[in-house]
Design a protein with these regions (language model features):
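Ser/Thr/Pro/Gly-rich, low-complexity intrinsically disordered stalk/linker tracts of secreted
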Residues: 1-311
Length: 311
């Protein structure tokens, strides 16, 4: 809900008079989407609840509220402080600073201007916080092992198709493993598992060299506001050596890569040393004292040993 406040100069006729709000055409931050409204409902809280609203409609940037002059509805008198609650207003798709470029105009029933002002301020729109965050890596929290990882969170704001989920993995600057969490390919398979109904989004994954995995939403489903989401990452590889628990940060963005929610952090597991398995042996071809010959060392790895500099 949003509250629109203003004071009239001239009277707005109670039968067919109108209040028009023209919202900003653009913002310096260039969000993909500016203010929109989905079937707005308008009620006056001042000067009185019986000001009377016949209809409210939103088209492109303009909210038009038409007064209802029937019965005891009073309309808007001259020199009166007014406040009206507007429901179903969607804020811009990413963070924007306040601007004073909105316009309020009141008209008579013939759509002729009564009052107008062009310096109405909108709010600062700030990043929301993701909640219920969690991250799990491969089933065995062991160095060098790859497997199915899961990231889960609940959105604050909606992410439209073409928007992104950006996951930044820890640097592990204290332990300095050869690599941190990574994918063996640049385009890991990502799959939303929650929600599981027809609103489930689809996405592609990109994980080039570095610590950042980016999901770009595709198809026709958005990430809805205030909804739990979870997605899996195929073959995410744990860091190359033992590391302490750290944090992974998740941010949602609109299609212009501008921040919507986050970044919000959650813990990564401690990555432990694996236990060498299989048949462990060191067998020589000659088994008598003092003889130089070949030996065969046999074992099975748990985690991957990096091909460049691994030991």
């Amino acid at each position: 809900n949003h509250l629109l406040s203003f004071s009239t100069v001239g009277q707005v006729p109670k039968a067919g008079g109108k209040v028009l709000l023209l919202l900003p055409a653009s913002f310096t931050e260039s969000p993909t989407q500016t203010y929109t409204m989905d079937s707005p409902v308008v009620t006056f809280t001042s000067p009185a609840a019986n000001a009377g609203v016949a209809s409210a409609a939103f088209n492109t940037r303009t909210l038009t509220v038409t007064m209802d002059g029937t019965g005891s509805n009073a309309g808007l008198g001259q020199g009166v402080a007014c406040a009206m609650k507007v429901t179903n207003v969607r804020t811009p798709s990413s963070i924007v600073a306040s601007v004073s470029t909105s316009e309020i105009t009141t008209t008579d029933a013939a759509n002729k201007n009564v009052d107008t002002v062009a310096t109405v301020a909108t709010d600062d729109v700030v990043a929301g916080s993701l909640t219920s965050m969690s991250f799990s890596s491969a089933a065995a929290a062991t160095a060098g092992v790859s497997g199915l990882a899961t990231v889960a969170f609940t959105t604050a704001g909606q992410v439209s198709v073409g928007g992104k989920v950006v996951v930044t993995f820890p640097a592990h600057s204290s332990e300095l493993p050869t690599f941190g969490f990574k994918s063996d390919g640049d385009t890991p398979a990502v799959l939303f598992t929650t929600p599981s109904d027809g609103t489930k989004p689809t996405a592609t994954g990109a994980f080039p060299a570095g610590r950042v995995l980016t999901l770009t939403t595709t198809g026709s489903n958005k990430l809805l506001q205030g909804v739990a989401h979870a997605f899996t990452i195929a073959d995410l590889r744990n860091p190359s050596s033992v590391v302490a628990a750290a944090t992974v940060a998740v941010e949602t963005q609109d299609a212009a890569s501008k921040a919507c929610d986050g970044p919000t952090s959650t813990a990564t597991p401690q990555i432990a040393v694996g236990t060498i398995g299989g048949t462990k042996s060191f067998v020589g071809t000659v088994k008598t004292p003092g003889v130089k010959g070949n030996h065969l060392l046999s074992f099975s790895t748990v985690g991957q040993v990096p091909k460049a500099g691994g030991k």
